[in-house]
Swiss-Prot record:
Keywords: Antibiotic, Antimicrobial, Disulfide bond, Glycoprotein, Immunity, Innate immunity, Secreted, Signal. It comes from Sebastes schlegelii (Korean rockfish). GO terms for cellular component: extracellular space. The gene is BPI. Residues 28-209 are annotated as: N-terminal barrel. SUPFAM superfamilies: Bactericidal permeability-increasing protein, BPI (SSF55394). This is Bactericidal permeability-increasing protein. It is found in: Secreted. Glycans are attached at residue 365. The lineage of its organism: Eukaryota, Metazoa, Chordata, Craniata, Vertebrata. Residues 453-472 are annotated as: Central sheet, part 3. The keyword Protease does not apply.
Length: 473
C-alpha cells in the first residue's frame, strides 16, 4: 500500500489537453529516495511468495549409472535486498533496479538408483547475485487517474548453490551442477512475471486518489491531469487541473489559468504549487452558489458594543430612519455583487470584494421594510496555512469604502456610517468568514499520507508548499 501510494504520486501524469494547470506538483530526488526505502519492504515480501515448482529428472552418474531424482516442497525462507535504486526515466516514469539480492530456500530430495535403492533427505539452497531491472511506465486512464505497468524487465540469477542433508547426500553432490542450473532457470523465469504482477496490483490502490475531492455542501475540487509530465534527471513536474466546481454542476469560470513555472527548489520531497486561478475559481463557485451572502441581526453584535442594529442607533446618523421607523430592530443583508478577486504577490495575499449591504427595519409583524442599499468595497489581507492535508486561511480587514446605491429614506451622508460598518465587518462578518476558511479544502492526497516539515511561500501569482511526506499505512 505504501509503495503504491508513493508511485501514485509519481503517477499523476496528466492527459494531454491544451490548458494550463491550476496546481503543479514536483516530486524530487529526495522524494524518490523515500519511496525506494518504503518500497523495498513491500518488494521483499513479494519475493518471498515465489513458488518454485518441483523438479525431477534422470541423470547418469559414474560409477552408479542412471539416477532418478526429485526436489519438492521448496520454500523461500529468507530474502535480502542489500542494493536497490529508483531512478527517473525521462518521458516514461521510473526505473527500479535491484542488485546483489539473495534468496535462501529449503526443500526435500528423493533419489532412486540401481533400480531398487531409494533414499531421501533435505537440502538448503543459496541463490546469490540476483538482479532485477524494470521500468515502471506511468500513464493516465480515461478518467485522469494513474495507471502503472512494468516494461522492459530483465532478471538474472548469478549463482545457485545447493547443499544436501541426510541419506545419500553424497550422491546428489555428484550432479549438483545439473540441479543448480534447473533451479536457477526456474527462478529466473518467475522474476519478471512476479514483478509485473506486483506492479499491476498497485492499480486498484491508485484508484483511491482524490481526483475529485468534496470540499463542503457547495463545492468540490478537481485534480485530474491536464498535460504530460516533465521528467528531468532530478525531479518530476506534473500538472493538475486544480479547479473548484459547484457540486453536480461543472461550470467553467469566465477566466482561465495563466502559465507559471516552479522555482528550482529540490530540498523537500514534494512541492505543491497552488495558483491564484485555483483560489479564484473557488470564489466563482461560492458566489455562483449564492453562498457569499449573510443576514446580520442584532444578536450577532457583541453585547458590550455600543452599536446596536436598531433604528435608534442608525437614526443618530440618518434622522429619517428614526422618524419613520421608531423603536424598531434592524437587519442587514451583506451580499457579494460579483466574484471576489484574489491576488498573490510575494509574501502577500489580498482579496478584493464588491458587495451590497441592504438595511431593513423589522416591523412588529416581522415584515422587512427596506431602508437603503449601500455599495461596499472591501480589501482584506489573507494568511494561508497548511492544516493536516488541507489548505486553510484567515483574513483581516485592510480597508473599506461605502457609497450609496439606493435610499428609501431620502438623502444622507454615507460616510457617517463608516464607523458602524467597520464594527459590523470586524466583529461579525470577518469572524464568520474565518470560521469557514479555517476548515480549508483538500490538497491532492494519496492513501494515508501525512505532510511534515511543511513551509508555505507566497510568490507572484501562486503559492508554493514545500514539504516532506510520511505514509502511515
Amino acid at each position: 500500500m505504501v509503495l503504491c501510494c508513493w508511485l501514485a504520486l509519481v503517477a499523476l501524469i496528466p492527459m494531454t489537453l491544451s490548458i494550463n494547470p491550476g496546481v503543479k506538483v514536483r516530486l524530487t530526488g529526495k522524494g524518490l529516495e523515500y519511496g525506494r526505502q518504503l518500497g523495498m519492504a513491500s518488494i521483499q515480501q513479494k519475493l518471498k511468495t515465489i513458488k518454485v515448482p518441483d523438479i525431477s529428472g534422470k541423470q547418469r552418474v559414474s560409477p552408479i549409472g542412471k539416477v532418478k531424482y526429485s526436489l519438492s516442497n521448496m520454500q523461500i525462507v529468507d530474502v535480502g535486498l542489500p542494493k536497490s535504486a529508483l531512478d527517473l526515466v525521462p518521458g516514461t516514469g521510473v526505473k527500479l533496479s535491484i542488485g546483489n539480492a539473495f534468496l535462501r530456500m529449503h526443500g526435500n530430495w528423493r533419489v532412486k538408483y540401481l533400480r531398487i535403492i531409494k533414499d531421501s533427505g533435505s537440502f538448503d539452497l543459496n541463490v546469490n547475485d540476483l538482479t532485477i531491472t524494470t521500468t515502471i511506465a506511468i500513464k493516465s486512464d480515461e478518467t485522469g487517474r494513474p495507471v502503472v505497468s512494468s516494461v522492459n524487465c530483465a532478471a538474472t540469477v548469478g549463482s545457485a548453490k545447493i547443499k544436501f542433508h541426510g541419506g545419500a547426500s553424497w550422491l546428489y553432490n555428484l550432479f549438483r551442477k545439473f540441479v543448480d542450473k534447473a533451479i536457477r532457470n526456474a527462478l529466473q523465469k518467475q522474476m519478471c512475471p512476479l514483478v509485473a504482477n506486483a506492479v499491476s496490483d498497485l492499480n486498484p490502490q491508485l484508484k483511491t486518489l482524490n481526483v475529485l475531492a468534496k470540499v463542503d455542501q457547495y463545492a468540490e475540487i478537481e485534480y485530474s491531469m491536464v498535460s504530460s509530465p516533465t521528467v528531468s534527471n532530478s525531479c518530476i513536474d506534473f500538472s493538475l487541473k486544480g479547479e473548484f466546481y459547484n457540486i453536480g454542476k461543472h461550470q467553467e469560470p469566465p477566466f482561465s489559468p495563466a502559465a507559471f513555472s516552479l522555482p528550482p527548489q529540490i530540498n523537500n520531497m514534494l512541492y505543491i504549487s497552488v495558483s491564484a486561478f485555483t483560489i479564484n475559481s473557488a470564489a466563482f463557485v461560492y458566489n455562483t452558489a449564492g453562498a457569499l451572502s449573510l443576514y446580520i441581526t442584532d444578536d450577532m453584535i457583541p453585547q458590550a458594543s455600543p452599536i446596536r442594529l436598531n433604528t435608534r442607533t442608525f437614526g443618530a446618523f440618518i434622522p429619517q430612519v428614526a422618524k419613520r421607523f421608531p423603536g424598531l430592530m434592524m437587519k442587514l443583508l451583506v451580499k457579494t455583487a460579483k466574484n471576489p478577486v484574489v491576488t498573490f504577490e510575494p509574501n502577500k495575499v489580498t482579496v478584493q470584494a464588491t458587495s451590497t449591504v441592504t438595511a431593513y427595519a423589522i416591523q412588529p409583524n416581522t415584515t422587512l421594510s427596506p431602508l437603503f442599499v449601500l455599495n461596499l468595497e472591501t480589501s482584506v489581507s489573507a494568511r494561508v496555512f497548511v492544516s493536516g492535508m488541507r489548505l486553510a486561511g484567515a483574513v483581516t480587514l485592510n480597508k473599506m469604502a461605502l457609497t450609496l446605491g439606493t435610499s428609501y429614506v431620502g438623502e444622507f451622508q454615507v460616510r457617517s456610517l463608516d464607523s458602524i460598518f467597520q464594527v459590523v465587518l470586524k466583529v461579525v462578518v470577518i469572524p464568520i468568514l474565518n470560521v469557514q476558511l479555517a476548515k480549508g479544502y483538500p490538497l491532492p492526497t494519496l492513501g494515508k499520507m501525512k505532510l511534515v516539515n511543511t513551509e508555505l511561500q507566497v510568490l507572484k501569482d501562486y503559492m508554493l508548499i514545500g514539504t516532506d511526506v510520511q505514509f502511515t499505512g
